[in-house]
Amino acid sequence: MAKLIASYKSDGPEPKTIYEKYLDHTSNYKQQYGERTIVLMMVGSFYEVYGLKSASGDISGSEIVAFSQICQMNISEKKKVSVNGNTVLMAGFPEYTLERYLQKLSDVGFTSVVIIQDEENSVHGDKKKHIVHSIHSAGTFISYDVEQPKLSNNIMCVWLSSYNSLVKSRAQLVYGVAVINIFTGKSFIFEHKTTFENNPTTFDELERAVSIYNPCEVILLYDLAKITENESALVKNIKSYAGIDCNSIHEFCIRDSTKTENCMKQQYIVQLLETFFGSECYETCEEFSRYPVATQSFCYLLNFIQEHNPSLIKKIHTPTFGSTSVNAILANHTLKQLNIIEDKSADSVRSGKFSSVLNFLNRACTPIGKRRIQDLLTSPVFDEEWLNNEYNMISQMLSAENYHFISFFRKQLADVTDLEKIMRQILVKKVSPSTVFRLYESVLKIQQIHVCLEENRELMDYLPNSECIAKASETICSKISGFLVVDACKNINSATVSEHIVKKGVDSELDALMQEYQVANDLLNGIHRFLNMVLRASLNLPDDSDYVKMNTTEKMGSSLQITKTRSKVLKQLLEKDEYSGMPCFRGILTKVKTGTVLFHGSMIEFGDLKFKPATTTAEEITFDQLTKLTSKVLKLEHGIEHKIAVLYAEFVEKVLENECYEHIDKIVEYVASLDVLQSKTYVAKENRYCRPQIADGEHSFLKAVGIRHCLIEHLQQNEIYVANDVEISSGGILLYGTNAVGKTSLIRAIGIATILAQCGFFVPCSSFQFKPYQSFYTRILGNDNLYKGLSTFGVEMSEL
């Protein structure tokens, strides 16, 4: 859970009741984050949501109805409780299920404000003082779960600003975009300037960013007064043009916000950036000053996340800038028109792994590798040295002496968990013991891979951090196994740790508690066994059943219970004292005096034995020694549980964050490069792709023999696929032909192959020679349907 980040105080008179406090908080946070905001207030051991119901049946005050539908909760009325004449409604859930419902609310775009009881500052036992603990939204929520199908959780901020140019007659538009992936801490910013036209083309670059990053939460900041009087209508159009359709969208006018005003001040920007990226970062990273609107957007986003959960932006990566000296330009929806990424059509979705080039060719085995390949395939480059290095490594891995490594890599990497996400969970203190177990097991897998590769000098030179992986792996494993009983952590998925997972010798106070608990628990178990043996021996009962049962509850601890009928028998047997001479007790029981025996070395004093009702059919066995013993065991259990929780929290911060974090980071880069390499190699081998050859030339060109469309050749299995030869020089070519002969398919195949080559992949050709391109422009009408095998003409005919 996040640290305390705010304590709200109303400007008006102090609300008298908890219901008024709740409604006051709700009103305040709705103003900040919009109508889709819900306050979760801790009351006792529950989180509760309140609302008001008028005499006419109207419900107001909060989003309690939506909350009940999303979380499948019942709404109840508080009897004899009202606020301003309105009946108070209530819904809620136990404290320990908070994580589950935060996930549900975040998934549908709600912002959840978690308010807890301030136990430390309550006066005279008053438990009704409350403080804001954390704020969660779709783009700022990170759970304890590691094994999620969702690879990224991106939050995006778009800053739209209009201005009048001295050299241009028409109004100009500039928009800066910032994206942060809270699963990895990586960020991206870019800026685009253009003459304003109210059409989709103006927002091509924005649409490309939205398509690539698929944000789950978007903040739209706008000042479009120089363009239109109806800014809200234009913002609605912009969302449509850019494909912004996530559940959580916040819209703010720049002129009406103090926060945006701060983000336009250079002193504030410099101070904020230096806080996260070190002193002089503004001067050394010239892109911050070159792209001021994008930087403003980034600063606003940092502040927004910090308000929600300050830990999320600890050790955040310096942003990647959209325009670099080696990245090719992708214009006019290139990625979608070439099916590099999904177009989200029904036919595309039904096609599964063939829905896009990315889905088909991304054969990475780890979430880390899958994210890295997505970044690669959406950012082609024209850096010839880097490209040739990638081709060389794939060729080397395809050789007979190395290809056997690929199956080994895929098997080992399949068991490697999302280490990047775990790094963020460590920073926000949301690491369950089961996550630590997965981290430990994953590092062992990486260690095994590294041992096998140490003799391969070329591969070691290619993989980043290869020289320190052995030390990093050993450090992480030794730190974890030196503190925790690793196997005991395997199935503990919550933050509440009740099992004994801390190793003996780590903490002397815990060891003393454990020793005392062991002695007390052994005595309790001894009493339990003794009473059962008395019944079995005296009545010749089978040995495979307990006639005196141990009943344990979290609140009351352990107790010994027996049926009412057998309780009378047991009392008589103990009073007659005939059991002590029976053969089964020989050598293990000594009678000290009436009502006192020495059983297996433990003194049991049951002289004051009594029975009290426990249930309708059972009674609880009590005597002074047993009552004190069960109370002591319960107290020790709570003490041990608290001590383990404290030690585990210290372990996460002092060991995982302070001592292991940098080592995990090095392993992440190593795994990412290894997984991407094996994926590229595996795809090339499985699909018979060839190595691109980069040729010298004054201008970009390509010459492909036997070029194929990487999706169509798998989607259309009912006909023989006919490959094509094509050569495009600086003058281009005119491609023409009759209907349904594959013109569009060939155009797409050329575009896909060239982009694959410039992403460091082998390509679906017999041979492919080219000079890398610095920009890609596509204009392919989306009237065909490659998933159904229909050309543009075929689609038109089928619609008749």
Question: What does each of the following model-derived ranges do?
Answer:
Residues 505-556:
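N-terminal accessory targeting/assembly segments
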Residues 219, 294-339, 349-350, 359-360, ...:
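Structured, non-catalytic alpha/beta "coupling" segments that mediate domain-domain communication
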Residues 44, 105, 218, 369, ...:
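Residue-level signature of catalytic and energy-coupling elements of molecular machines
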Residues 117-118, 312-322, 531-552, 679-706, ...:
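Long, charged, glycine-rich C-terminal linkers/tails
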Residues 46-79, 217-219, 223-278, 355, ...:
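A conserved P-loop NTPase coupling/switch region
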Residues 1-373, 378, 385-399, 403, ...:
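Basic, polar low-complexity surface loops/patches
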Residues 171-173, 287, 291, 569-576, ...:
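ATPase nucleotide-binding head domains, primarily ABC-like/P-loop NTPase cores
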